[in-house]
């Protein structure tokens, strides 16, 4: 509960780190690495929509839902409801994939759901299932179980080969092998499952 309550409150860790070393945080060098990216721009109870790094976001939202359920925190549950509605209605592919933007592996803006450059990280599908499960434990609503099923079959199971030795990090809806090789906007897409990734979740 402490970490949920502290998220988005001053002082922010990365800002304090910058003061300590008398320079901007390493993480502040890129424009998109801001407090919204870390889901820390406002206290969690004030968050209106899914934002930032998709995997970290749904892990945070899972924690928020668990704390809301255990403590009866109505304000926190309302934030979870708003965020869930945003994901389910404006940020999710028909496959259950989330996190459409390859820059920062993140949520983008409403209805930005491209097929060929979709990120839809396998780990985000797993995190979405965690969030949906926790929401389903609070209230029986088929939107949660439907999202779990879509994410499981289209983003989790598909992310690993049957022998468990090769993986998809991203799950776009359209793959052109030539584009993966020659177009910089497709460099994050692999046409076949890979043995290993530089950053494995």
Model-derived features with residue positions:
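Glycan-recognition and catalytic cores of secretory/periplasmic carbohydrate-active enzymes
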Residues: 1-201
